[in-house]
Amino acid sequence: MTYRAWNLKPLDRAALRELTQAIAEQATEELEYNAQDDEPWSEQKYAAVLAAQQKENALLAGVLTARGITDPTEALTLLAGEEELSDPSLLTDMDKACERIWRAIDEGETIVVFGDYDVDGVTATALLYQHLKGMGATVKCMLPSREGDGYGLSRNAIRSIHDKGCKLIVTVDNGISAVEEADYAAELGIDLIITDHHLPPETLPKAIAVVDPRREDDTSPFKGLCGAGVAFKLCAALDGCPPEEMLDYCGDLAAVGTVADVMPLTGENRTLVKAGLRQLQNTDRPGLEALLEEVGLAGKPVTAENVSYAIAPRINAAGRMDNAVTALQLVMCEDPDRAAELAHKLNEINTKRQETELQIFKAAQELLEQEPERLEDRVMLLWGRDWHPGVIGIVASRLVERTGRPVIVVTIDEHGECKGSGRSVQGFNLHACIGACADLLIRYGGHAMAAGLSVREENLPALRRRLNDWAARECPVLHTTPLECDLPIHLDRVTVESVRKLDQLAPYGAENPTPVFLLQNAVLDGVYPVSEGRHSRLRLRQGNASVYAVWFGMPPEQLPYAMGDVVDAALNLSVYDSPRGAQLSGRILDLHPAGLGTKLAEQAAFVVALRRGTPLTEEQKKLITPERSDIVTVYRELQARRWHAEDLQPLCAKLGEENTGKTLVAVTALEQVG
């Protein structure tokens, strides 16, 4: 079990009052203006409306203040979503890219748009391809196969393009690392324009233009664009129009790519995604319309969360399980009947992806049960035969969530060649860890939080040992990243209207997460199964007010709390419209016994380190070393009540927060003696 600490953000009360007043005044003035009354409001009416708006906007102002946004002007600009999109020409080499593309159009050359097999790559390809078509260009598009070609521009792809007589390649969402491939293209007489958003290597590829906001010498102000975002800027530059005008034509594709690639939803991305989601709701693209219909979102407001959990996985599934061309065909499809067929096919592929992912996840869990010593590894390296390489990265992510440590999942083919995909946790550089074992690998790549590798089967045991040796030296105690809580709440002060006001903070995503609230000293009043028992719906009561909240992935029989327990809950809040009217709803992220602070997660990390043989300071040892009487107390508690072995938080709470580490060590000792 991973014990996670919570971090409640500090709150400047004076700044909160000032910001609440500013937001309330703005809202009141808008209400007065929209009322279009014949006479200006009286002072009494204005004051009454202002007081109501102060109450309704207090929750919104609290979240903004907790996130450090205390300047009223900055806050009101953010809430209005009015951040301007910067001039595309500020991107270094954008002028060179446009000049070469214009010349190709004028001279009737065939332009090849070369993309990638993920959502960002597919949407970027469709976006640029369709825009060039609209400009009258002769254009083709090409996507690599995940298994056959691998990521990015390859020599085989360049040779194929050359053999078809094409002389200009424009990459989207890839190419920044294609140094050798760029040289090869030049040898064949092919001009190359690179548009990408990934971190460049020390030496840039030699190309006609290299457009990447993350170039060291790039002069554009915003560095958080995804591949589709860069392609969007290229289209605006080619048209010579403000990027805001381009939003009406391809903002939907740019928004899907941005959200799916987990780019920060701040700055220009916030403006782009906000506009793109509105366009997506009323899209005139038959392919996207069919996909929305397939996932039950037709005619409904589309959120960034809908893109992340419903739209993006289906587009991604094609590249993972089959061929990304299927997804590209859907996005660009203009025939509604054909679009419906393709959307249904993608849905079936995604279902297969989910089934395959679950099979591998269960196999990995069985491996851990058969070899429990792997649970002591700082970096978990798990391997199996013929696991589908398209989903091992997703499985690694799920295992990271479950174990709280870096995980690499490896599939072995019939030739003994292995491909691995790893995911990390904050504070642990997985790329550096893997790089320290480079002599055992065929190749590797990635970054601190995610990496991939290729290795021979016979080197896997040595790789596991070396990964953990490096981790023991460089990161002996791995603390779980705390769950950031924005604001403590009291249910009797939270209304449907105040929660609706939070919609102004959307779209939510990377660097702009859904607000997390801390509900303290709530009584667990009810537990109900959801989705055939896969999830739990809890009724939490605080004073005379209560809220129903769903805990996804927590079956009722595994819930480590009983009716009547007093708990603290970290949760999101939303509003749903029921036959009985609008009601508050919650989504539980974590649950602690009431009053249990950060000591549980902190001392649990020391216990894990002790079990792994990591040297601890005398002070750390003292914190977690139980006396004989402590072990006796724990034994009696275990005999008196059936505590869940997967979650001992309630037991730790009962025996005292300051004794958390001692309790966990005592449980471990009792497990070892049976």
Over which residues does each language-model region extend?
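Short alpha-helices
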Residues: 127, 206-259
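Hydrophobic helix-and-loop "lid/oligomerization" segment in the mid-to-C-terminal part
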Residues: 3, 10-13, 17, 41-42, ...
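Terminal, basic amphipathic appendages of nucleotide-handling enzymes
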Residues: 1-48, 66, 70-80, 84-85, ...
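Conserved acidic residues
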Residues: 167, 208, 568
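Histidine/acidic-residue-rich, glycine-tolerant segments that coordinate divalent metal ions
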Residues: 172-225
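Short amphipathic alpha-helical segments and helix-helix/interface helices
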Residues: 158, 182-183, 667
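Acidic, two-metal ion nucleic-acid-processing modules in DNA metabolism proteins
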Residues: 133, 138, 270-313, 317-365, ...
